[in-house]
């Protein structure tokens, strides 16, 4: 009877909180925050060059570092959400911090004394920004970076938590990615156009408006959300497994179920297992009952579920590193595309000139379109012909191939551009389009699939971390791209400040080599990887719904 009452209360609570009524609040928040983020970050290189008189390659490096930090910090936000505050308060606080940062950027664009004097036309010697000016700029960037990091990927977890069924979570992820790309496209076109053709003050001011609306809408829907309850740090259990296994490293591993420790509540979880798996067998000692063990000493005796959760994280590490080297070439291409566009003919007709920072919108539009096409046509047609769905890893593999192809096309186009420059002509910026389109198609395959893999395969207690892990991978990839550009600049003459006298085509060829090597590594990793949550047809269908 007590259990029945408890179930009724749970059902009543679920009917009042969460569900599809929360979708508009989540999506409007995501849309506004995406417009804000892409509105300032996509044109950051141009802003640093034109408004702070920073050299082109130095501006690229600063942009890569900024992108790295903004993609690394979500894991910190995820830890705060999982361990202490829950994801709803973290998103609210982060949206406000972002609003403070973008407001400060707007002030910098509005007040002349917060920027160095602009270079005179044709002048080589330009006034460098003062320490105070750089300090205020970096403070603004730090605030808006922190705010962005605590919203984008935590919103994915918070939104998915509003639904109980994997199929509904899958539909939410579709809306999430569509809205994310929609905000990115709006920020990269409308906001960047306003910055280049009206003023930086107007462009950043529009970002302030978008951020403010996001913050108000999200807070307004707070009473409707299903709030997750932080249960203390889930990372402690991972450390405890390692400590317990080390303490009992001399114990003989048993093959009997009764020799291993279980907790009653774990039997209700979807991933419950009676016996520890054979992989990473040395960790099984953490759950092995030995003389002197006490159920109260969790640093010496862990449960089988905790051991298997730790193994699940370890199994994903090779895939995690392969995604990292998949994203690094994309980060370099993103930066180089802006520099290339700045020295190309950007006129489309007699009155319209494309913004250099807006060129990346082509990849975003391509990705958005092909996410829809994949879900509506490509994946259903494949399943109809082959009689089984594309797995998430197969989708990531297709993304690898398309990324390599994109880099190869970029190399060919840049080689042609340099020959055109030798003849004192400007090549049309439209030559950059094919590589960017293929880049976007590749992202439509690998980006949602990676999110689905990490969300579906991570332990339930680390779900916020799971969705932010893709962002961390992207962050590390930006640092790798920064290191790669630095090495190339130090060891070759391919990347001078004036790329018309460089060999960016050779940089792209290096990226092709990295991509091919990483694809081989990915094939090996995916061959040995076994899905944790694809043990039967139902689970396979669930993850297919999340990915598609």
UniProtKB/Swiss-Prot annotation:
It is a multi-pass membrane protein. Strongly expressed in the root stele. It comes from the Eukaryota. One of its GO terms (cellular component) is plasma membrane. The keyword Ligase does not apply. Keywords: Membrane, Nitrate assimilation, Transmembrane, Transmembrane helix, Transport. The chain crosses the membrane at residues 29-49, 65-85, 88-108, 136-156, 172-192, 200-220, 316-336, 354-374, 393-413, 429-449, 468-488, 508-528. The keyword Metal-binding does not apply. Gene3D superfamilies: MFS general substrate transporter like domains (1.20.1250.20). SUPFAM superfamilies: MFS general substrate transporter. It is found in: Membrane. GO terms for molecular function: chloride transmembrane transporter activity. GO terms for biological process: chloride transmembrane transport; nitrate assimilation; oligopeptide transport. InterPro entries: MFS_trans_sf, POT_fam, PTR2_symporter_CS. Belongs to the major facilitator superfamily. Proton-dependent oligopeptide transporter (POT/PTR) (TC 2.A.17) family. Transporter involved in a passive nitrate efflux. This is Protein NRT1/ PTR FAMILY 2.4. It comes from Arabidopsis thaliana.
């Amino acid at each position: 009877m007590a259990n029945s009452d408890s179930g009724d209360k749970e059902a009543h609570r679920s009917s009042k909180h969460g569900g599809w009524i929360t979708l508009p609040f989540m999506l409007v928040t995501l849309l506004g925050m995406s417009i804000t983020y892409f509105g300032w970050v996509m044109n950051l290189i141009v802003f640093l060059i034109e408004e702070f008189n920073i050299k082109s390659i130095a501006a690229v490096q600063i942009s890569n570092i900024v992108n790295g930090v903004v993609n690394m910090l979500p894991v910190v936000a995820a830890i705060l959400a999982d361990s202490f505050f829950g994801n709803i308060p973290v998103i609210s606080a982060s949206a406000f911090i972002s609003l403070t940062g973008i407001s400060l950027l707007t002030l910098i664009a509005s007040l002349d004394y917060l920027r160095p004097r602009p270079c005179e036309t044709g002048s080589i010697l330009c006034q460098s920004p003062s320490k105070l000016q750089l300090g205020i700029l970096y403070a603004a960037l730090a605030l808006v970076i922190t705010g962005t990091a605590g919203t984008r990927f935590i919103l994915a977890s918070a939104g998915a938590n509003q639904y109980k069924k994997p199929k509904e979570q899958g539909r939410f992820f579709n809306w999430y990615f569509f809205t994310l790309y929609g905000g990115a496209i709006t920020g990269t076109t409308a906001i960047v156009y306003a910055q280049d053709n009206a003023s930086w003050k107007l462009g950043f001011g529009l970002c302030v408006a978008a951020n403010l609306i996001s913050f108000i809408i999200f807070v307004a829907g707070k009473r409707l959300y299903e709030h997750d309850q932080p249960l203390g740090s889930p990372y402690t259990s991972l450390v405890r497994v390692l400590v317990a296994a080390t303490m009992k490293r001399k114990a003989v591993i048993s093959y009997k179920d009764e020799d291993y420790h279980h907790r009653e509540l774990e039997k209700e979880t979807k991933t419950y297992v009676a016996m520890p798996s054979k992989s990473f067998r040395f960790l099984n000692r953490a759950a092995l009952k030995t003389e002197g063990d006490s159920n109260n000493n969790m640093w010496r005796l862990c449960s089988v579920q905790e051991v298997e959760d730790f193994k699940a994280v370890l199994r994903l590490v090779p895939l995690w590193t392969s995604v990292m080297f998949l994203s690094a070439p994309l980060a370099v291409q993103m930066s180089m595309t802006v520099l290339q566009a700045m020295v190309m003919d950007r006129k489309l007709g007699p009155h319209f000139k494309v913004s250099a920072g807006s060129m990346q919108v082509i990849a975003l539009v391509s990705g958005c379109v092909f996410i829809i096409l994949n879900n509506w046509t490509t994946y259903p047609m494949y399943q109809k012909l082959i009689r089984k769905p594309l797995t998430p890893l197969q989708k990531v593999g297709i993304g690898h191939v398309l990324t390599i192809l994109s880099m190869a096309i970029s190399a060919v186009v840049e080689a042609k551009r340099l020959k055109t420059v030798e003849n004192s002509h400007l090549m049309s910026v439209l030559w950059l389009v094919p590589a960017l389109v293929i880049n976007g198609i590749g992202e439509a395959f690998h980006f949602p699939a990676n999110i689905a893999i990490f969300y579906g395969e991570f332990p339930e207690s680390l779900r916020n971390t799971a969705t932010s892990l893709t962002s961390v991978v992207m962050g590390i990839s930006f640092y790798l791209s920064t290191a790669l550009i630095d090495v190339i600049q130090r060891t070759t003459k391919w990347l001078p400040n004036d790329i018309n006298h460089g060999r960016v085509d050779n940089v792209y060829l290096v990226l092709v080599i990295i991509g091919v090597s990483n694809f081989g590594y990915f094939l090996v990793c995916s061959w040995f990887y076994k899905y944790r949550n694809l043990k039967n047809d139902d689970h396979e269908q669930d993850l297919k719904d999340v990915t598609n």
